[in-house]
Amino acid sequence: MGEVVFSTWGGKVVDHRGGPSGGGPSWAGEFGGRQLKAFIGWDGLVVTDPAVDLLAALQAYYQAVQGESCGRCVPCRVGTRVIYNVLVRIAGGEGLPSDLDLLRRVAWIVRDGSLCELGQAGAKAVLDFLDYYSEALRPFLEDSGRVAGGQRRPGPGGRVQVLASGRVLVGNDRGKGAAAASPAAGLTYKPFVTAPCLKRCPAHLDIPAYIDAIKDGRYEESLAIIRQRTALAGVLGRVCVHPCEENCRRGNVDEPLAIRGLKRFVADYEVKRGRRPVAVCGGNLFTGPWRPAGQAGGEETTAVTSGKKVAIIGAGPAGLSAAYQLAGRGYKVTIFEALPVAGGMLAVGIPSYRLPRDILAGEIEAIKALGVTINLNTRVGVDVTMDQLQRDYDAVFIATGLHASSRMGVAGEDEGYGGFIPGVKFLRDLNLDRCPSLEGKVVAVVGGGNVAMDCARSALRRGAREVHLIYRRSRAEMPAHATEVRDAEAEGVIYHFLVNPTALVAEKGNIKGMQCVRMKLGEPDDSGRRRPVPVPGTEFFLPCDIVVPAIGQAADLSFLDGRIEVGKRGTISVDPVTLATSVPGVFAGGDIVLGARTVVEAVAQGNRAAVSIDQYLRQGTTSPTVEDELDAWLEKVGVYDPEEDVGIYGGRPRQAERVAPLAERVKDFREVEGGFDFYAGRAEAERCLRCYRVGMMVLAGEGESNG
């Protein structure tokens, strides 16, 4: 890794131009095998090579910023162009002394007058350059650009270079400043665009772009942007836990944008007009937390026509996502699904009051329309073997998910009592119409995650007289999403916090209740949460007819026959970046690798697996991409500051999505949330600050420049 020569990143100046380099933030050394020489971006400048020509690099940077300007406001649209033109003039040896003051004034206007973050943050790089390099540059402008008798008198020099070391060089090619926007010999410029929300989204959807389209009423275009990276817009618009909203800079002002709700808004727009979801993947396997500047949606790729085949085990969100990307790329994809329906946990784990089955089915049909074959009721290891798949297909992706429940470890758990129904089975039977009526029953659900919430709320809808939820920690430690916790309580679920079951109690083979003990919180465990500890003498009996343990999920890996390496947690071991297993040509992703996680994380894993499978089928090997390297690097550098003072007035609260009346929604499994109406959806999109940030890497080695 190159030591820092000069940096203004994060408002902390590190200046070693006149002495040994070092200090400052940690910057990754290589991208695609090329050493990082400098970085220009939304929070300043960082240079690790004193010989980098900052003046030339700034031209390329502002060319990229100009290319990303939406054109809605004059300061950004015109101001960034003026900055670029003046930099070109100075670099070409045609600069005036007044140009430095002009640059500063225009940069201030861009920073303070732009409507979105692109311009506001984009001005910082040139302002930092002026603060620390203008005095070294000024004498050369005076020599090369005096005006006499109304005529410009060329100076003795030519093209001007401002090295990061502080030296200014003048060549003999005066007037060639425009060429300086191209990389110097031995360097490559790589501009890119990211955003706090885009970076936080596991699937790296281009959130500002699709919300921008909603602002303009371009709903079909908005949906097409989403579908570049996922076919499951309507699904994620309902069940995503929206981590992107945690990185929403609007939340620093008043409330985060309803990003998930806006995704649903455009997906519903299509459905309400009687249109079937249409896949627009197009084989674009760009999955990074950013996109190349000037290329909305990512780099285009050429479809494969080799006829190579990929087998996918499991039609859940990870398997469907991999199939979507690979089919769009031209591969022949077949999914093997043990269940009688496609969708995995989307179909048999999430109740229909959260995810209507017609929404899921429509998006699966769009994936099948790409040529994907889904073989239902086909269990690998029974109906077809792993040997057969490896023999008949060029690559295999395992995405079976976690369809077994974790054990509670209490007395009576293995006795086969009537009324003891593991949570995953409870939801599967419910969604496949195999669950008996719970009319008049008392149901006890054990657990504090989203599966436990789904079980509890579903039990109410199946007619349970009472539903108790037992959780061994406090409410604050519950892993379930806060909205689910709130809604379950509002619907009538009775919470028992700091309580743990110790034994099942049965009579004539049927559950009659549970022995429980009260808990207190001790020292933190491996999860970072305080460990629950039993309180002696607090044992009590909780009467109930049904016990539904939902404390975790487990994998069934019997079909692997021990040939693929499995980790200590009972999940498949893979390369954490490429998702390759211990067997060449076999990949795995989703919950079968991560453990019980979220739908959007499974989508991201499916997308990433498609990249590796494409690499493997083209090259015979897999390796991390530049996107992977930049993802890790941006994690360290930081794209979002939760303490940032955004500098605008608030007072535009988040729009409310429609919700079914409480008294009505527990009667059946009709969808609870109704999404935004037309006016609320547009109003919510208008709250977006469009927090795009343009960055540019200056890399060693010549190559194609995106600048």
Swiss-Prot record:
Localisation: Cytoplasm
Keyword Cytoplasm among record annotations: yes
Activity's thermal dependence: Optimum temperature is 85 degrees Celsius. In the absence of substrates, the enzyme is stable at 70 degrees Celsius but is rapidly inactivated at temperatures above 73 degrees Celsius.
Keywords, alphabetical: Cytoplasm, NADP, Oxidoreductase
Oxidoreductase is among the record's keywords: yes
Pfam families assigned: Fer4_20, NADH_4Fe-4S, Pyr_redox_2
GO molecular function: 4 iron, 4 sulfur cluster binding; FMN binding; glutamate synthase (NADPH) activity; NADH dehydrogenase (ubiquinone) activity
InterPro entries per UniProt: DPD_II, FAD/NAD-bd_sf, FAD/NAD-binding_dom, Helical_ferredxn, NADH-UbQ_OxRdtase_51kDa_CS, Nuop51_4Fe4S-bd, Nuop51_4Fe4S-bd_sf
Activity vs pH: Optimum pH is 7-9.5 (with NADP as electron acceptor).
GO terms under cellular component: cytoplasm
Top-tier EC class: oxidoreductase
Description of activity control: Activity is very sensitive to oxygen. The activity in growing cells is enhanced when selenite and molybdate are added together to the growth medium. Tungstate replaces and is better than molybdate. Selenite is incorporated into the enzyme. Requires a sulfhydryl compound for activity. Inhibited by cyanide, EDTA, hypophosphite and mercaptoethanol. Sulfite inhibits the activity with NADP but not with methyl viologen as electron acceptor.
Biological role: Component of a dehydrogenase that catalyzes the NADP-dependent reduction of CO(2) to formate, the first step in the synthesis of the methyl group of acetate during synthesis of acetate from CO(2). In vitro, can use methyl viologen and benzyl viologen in addition to its natural electron acceptor.
Subunit: Heterotetramer composed of two alpha (FdhA) and two beta (FdhB) subunits.
Protein name: NADP(+)-dependent formate dehydrogenase subunit beta
Source organism: Moorella thermoacetica
Organism lineage string: Bacteria, Bacillati, Bacillota, Clostridia, Moorellales
Gene: fdhB
